[in-house]
A protein has these predicted regions:
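Extreme N-terminal starter segment of soluble prokaryotic enzymes
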Residues: 1-5
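SAM-dependent methyltransferase catalytic region
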Residues: 6, 10, 225-227
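A conditional alpha-helix N-cap/helix-loop micro-motif detector
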Residues: 7, 58-62, 146
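Conserved SAM/SAH-binding loop
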Residues: 8-12, 219-220
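Short, well-ordered alpha-helical scaffold segments within catalytic/effector domains
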Residues: 11, 62-66, 150-154
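Class I S-adenosyl-L-methionine
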Residues: 17-27, 31, 35-50, 70-227
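A short acidic, glycine-rich active-site loop
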Residues: 49-63
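A short glycine-rich, Lys/Arg-flanked "PGG" loop and its adjoining helix->strand segment in the class I
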Residues: 59-75
Length: 227
């Protein structure tokens, strides 16, 4: 089993690949809505870059990105697909992440997130609460303002991947997809252009999957058991 993460532009990487290099790609591209400090429920913490530095969400990817993703992948899941309908074919297999866990919600946050797919299955709903600071995954290490929980990717892999599949995430961000793939035994390739998120996601992966803890003096301590 391999798990590779590259600090590179995903479009350049995909252009270097032959057709259908991956069995399943799961992408979480920028929605083009930006994230302003104090308006997204994510305060500032030592584990994340300041939101003042967030520029990656100012615009959505070009059509070329989606064309390349579909070329190098057999099956594709794209979070925020409702923002890209003018760039993607019509889909009958949407995935819904119910972030309220089926309960009534009056917050400023969206009740759900939608994922477009190129598959022919029926619409499915995944329920896991994550509304700002109210979250069923509050103990998970947070390093990214739009971080999706590892449990979500575990569910996606259980339902849309099969044994032996090769998984790709073109914009790995927090690394949740990589962690889920590793723990479930899938070969994984990811790209992350931002150097800070790239390094933080490696640190998170090493902690959650390899039991490594980076000490203040820069040394690495390895846990004998994981939690």
């Amino acid at each position: 089993m391999t798990s590779d993460l590259f600090n590179t532009d995903c479009l350049d990487y995909m252009k270097s690949l032959p057709d259908k290099s991956f069995d399943l790609s799961i992408a979480d591209p920028p929605f083009g809505v930006s994230y302003a400090r104090g308006k997204n429920g994510w305060g500032v913490c030592d584990n994340r870059p300041s939101l003042d530095d967030v520029k990656w969400d100012s615009k959505i990817p070009d059509k070329e990105f989606f064309d390349e993703l579909l070329r190098v992948s057999e099956s594709v899941i794209i979070w925020g697909g409702n923002y890209y309908t003018h760039l993607l074919p019509v889909s009958k297999c949407w995935i819904v992440w119910d972030k309220c866990d089926g309960t009534t919600n009056k917050s400023v946050f969206a009740d759900a997130e939608l994922a477009w797919t190129n598959m022919t299955k029926v619409v499915r709903i995944f329920r896991l609460r994550q509304m700002g600071f109210i979250s069923d995954t509050k103990d998970e290490m947070r390093i990214h303002p739009t971080q999706k929980p590892t449990e979500l990717y575990v569910w996606l892999l259980k339902n849309y991947a099969k044994e032996g599949d090769r998984i790709f995430d073109p914009m790995t961000g927090s690394g949740s997809s990589r962690i889920a793939a590793y723990k479930m035994g899938f070969d994984f390739v990811g790209c992350e252009l931002d150097k800070t998120y790239y390094e933080k996601s490696i640190e998170r992966f090493n902690l959650e999957c390899l039991g490594e803890i980076k000490l203040k003096d820069g040394l690495i301590a390895k846990q004998l058991t994981l939690f």
